[in-house]
């Protein structure tokens, strides 16, 4: 049951998508380590960097971080007070609500760049309302086949959904079936695509 990507709360935060600079990550394996690597490079240049990732290991707050510091409990409470009526009204999912909270928090903290991991797939993921400066795709393998399909090609098509028009894409080495899907999607979007060895 896929929902409209532009429903609240992501739609309510839509103005933020144009005010923040994003790096968008999708893939089956290695998203967390890749995000950490990107983060360390950006922070080494003096930039203020947000990270939205899932799942958390101990506390929910770990999902939303700025320069490695998790969002404070008080900020989570503030967000829920502001938007709880809308969240209940349209029965926003957990991940939609959390994604919108991350965008809102990164805007408040005035981050220079926000690194955003998809939670499930890519094409219909609630993070896919953003217009990233660059898309990064880690190795794709069988993943959430009950929701994304039971063939590698169908899963690759879902993950490739983060490729946007004229947006540079960097992908790790992929199996041929996956590579073909990414090449086709990049061509459709007139996006430059580069494969790198992991």
Regions found by a protein language model. Name each.
Residues 27, 95, 171-174:
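Glycine- and other small-residue-rich loops at beta-strand/loop junctions that grip anionic moieties
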Residues 11-57, 134-136:
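Walker A (P-loop) phosphate-binding motif
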Residues 15-18, 44-130, 146-148, 176:
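ATP-dependent carboxylate-amine ligase catalytic core
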Residues 38, 102, 182:
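Aromatic/hydrophobic pocket-lining residues that form π-stacking "cages" and hydrophobic walls in ligand
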Residues 1-2, 6-13:
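Short, small-residue-biased leader/transition segments that mark boundaries at the very start
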Residues 110-117, 132-198:
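Acidic, Mg2+-coordinating active-site environments of NTP-dependent enzymes
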Residues 5, 34, 95, 178:
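Hydrophobic (often cysteine-bearing) scaffold residues that line and stabilize catalytic clefts
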Residues 25-28, 32, 49, 99, ...:
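Buried hydrophobic positions in well-ordered alpha/beta secondary-structure cores of metabolic enzymes
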């Amino acid at each position: 049951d896929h929902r409209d990507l532009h429903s609240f709360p992501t739609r309510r935060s839509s103005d933020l998508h144009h005010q923040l600079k994003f790096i968008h990550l999708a893939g089956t394996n290695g998203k967390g380590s890749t995000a950490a690597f990107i983060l360390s490079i950006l922070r080494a240049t003096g930039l203020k960097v947000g990270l939205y990732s899932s799942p958390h290991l101990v506390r929910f707050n770990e999902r939303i971080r700025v320069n490695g510091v998790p969002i404070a409990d008080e900020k989570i409470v503030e967000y829920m007070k502001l938007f709880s009526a809308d969240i209940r009204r349209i029965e926003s999912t957990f991940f939609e609500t959390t994604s919108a909270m991350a965008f809102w928090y990164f805007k408040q903290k005035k981050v220079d760049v926000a690194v955003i991991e998809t939670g499930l797939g890519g094409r219909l993921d609630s993070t896919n309302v953003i217009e990233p400066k660059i898309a990064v795709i880690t190795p794709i393998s069988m993943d959430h086949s009950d929701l994304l399909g039971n063939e590698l090609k169908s899963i690759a098509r879902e993950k490739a959904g983060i490729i946007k028009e004229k947006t540079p894409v960097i992908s790790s080495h992929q199996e041929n079936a996956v590579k073909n899907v990414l090449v086709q999607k990049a061509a459709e979007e007139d996006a430059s695509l580069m494969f790198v060895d992991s």
